[in-house]
């Protein structure tokens, strides 16, 4: 399938974009383990994430996404703050951001992914 299915979420809002993998690094050294030392954008959580929901065909969206932190009442950002490694929380060192949010903040995510051509005409389910 040549069309890109784009997804993003700002809590639950969706949009589209792209990111580059070269600049990701953990944010600080908090809670570093031997496992954490091996995490990269290319190998983050490759296993099926929810054993109770196993599907024969699935695609992980883990990896680098763009992110932005804005006031909670702000519009969709035109420019994003940087890269975040999904599935890690923005507060986590492994996210590459390591930033605390307040109740007055909104966190926006943006990425692009390709739907496999074998899935053409099938129903898709996105889990966040």
Identify the residue ranges that each predicted region occupies.
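Positively charged n-region of N-terminal signal peptides that target proteins for export
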Residues: 1-4
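Low-complexity, intrinsically disordered short segments enriched for Gly/Pro and polybasic residues
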Residues: 6-8, 98-99
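Bacterial N-terminal signal peptides
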Residues: 7-16
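Sec/Tat signal peptide C-region and signal peptidase I cleavage site
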Residues: 17-21
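Extended carbohydrate-recognition surfaces in non-catalytic/accessory domains of CAZymes
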Residues: 22-127
């Amino acid at each position: 399938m040549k069309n890109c299915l784009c997804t993003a979420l700002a809590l639950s809002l969706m949009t589209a974009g792209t990111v580059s993998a070269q600049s990701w690094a953990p944010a600080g050294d908090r809670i570093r383990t031997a496992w954490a030392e091996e995490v990269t954008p290319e190998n983050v959580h490759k296993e099926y994430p929810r054993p109770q929901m196993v599907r024969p065909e699935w695609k992980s969206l883990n990896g680098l996404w763009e992110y932005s932190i804005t006031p909670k009442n702000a519009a969709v950002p035109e420019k994003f703050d940087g890269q975040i490694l999904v599935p890690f929380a923005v507060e986590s060192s492994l996210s590459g951001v390591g930033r605390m949010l307040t109740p007055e903040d909104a966190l926006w995510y943006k990425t692009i992914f390709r739907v496999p051509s074998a899935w053409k005409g099938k129903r898709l389910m996105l889990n966040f």
